[in-house]
Amino acid sequence: MIFHTGTTKPTLVLLCCIGTWLATCSLSFGAPISKEDLRTTIDLLKQESQDLYNNYSIKQASGMSADESIQLPCFSLDREALTNISVIIAHLEKVKVLSENTVDTSWVIRWLTNISCFNPLNLNISVPGNTDESYDCKVFVLTVLKQFSNCMAELQAKDNTTC
């Protein structure tokens, strides 16, 4: 038998301990989430986006139509994920402010942040029209909620065709 002398054994023990520590702590440092958690989060986003849009369009923007000139990127998990998620989060934060917190987007923002591998970029979204006008604010909020809901529904359709 060949016996190794030196620091091999302590190094392996240290490596195993650090590897275990990193594996248990990595989720809090922005590591990718598991596929199960991702699937659950996407399902929650789909449902919440639809609920937010339906509630707002019925209760606060009845009879109004969305502004087609405002374009929100669709949700994706490809190379543009960080940028798309950052833009969506910025729009949803603006929705919360413009609706005077009557539209609570905090859960959606939290879920989007959780599935992003990096911290989302801080973006400033300009609102078309006069923000002092209630109508312009409502149209903006309705448009963002509708587009986000539609994007999540399209994601649902793509999921159903690939399964």
From Swiss-Prot:
Assigned keywords, A-Z: Cytokine, Glycoprotein, Immunity, Secreted, Signal
Glycosylation sites: 55, 84, 124
Swiss-Prot/TrEMBL GO biological process terms: immune system process
InterPro entries in the record: IL-31
Stretch forming the signal peptide: 1-23
The keyword Glycoprotein is assigned to this record: yes
Subcellular location: Secreted
GO MF terms, alphabetically ordered: cytokine activity; cytokine receptor binding; oncostatin-M receptor binding
Highest taxon listed in the record's lineage: Eukaryota
Main location per the UniProt record: secreted
Any one cellular-component term (Gene Ontology): extracellular space
Pfam families, alphabetized: IL31
Role played: Activates STAT3 and possibly STAT1 and STAT5 through the IL31 heterodimeric receptor composed of IL31RA and OSMR. May function in skin immunity. Enhances myeloid progenitor cell survival in vitro. Induces RETNLA and serum amyloid A protein expression in macrophages.
Extra remark: Il31 transgenic mice develop dermatitis. A similar phenotype is caused by local delivery of Il31.
PANTHER family noted in UniProt: INTERLEUKIN-31
Protein name: Interleukin-31
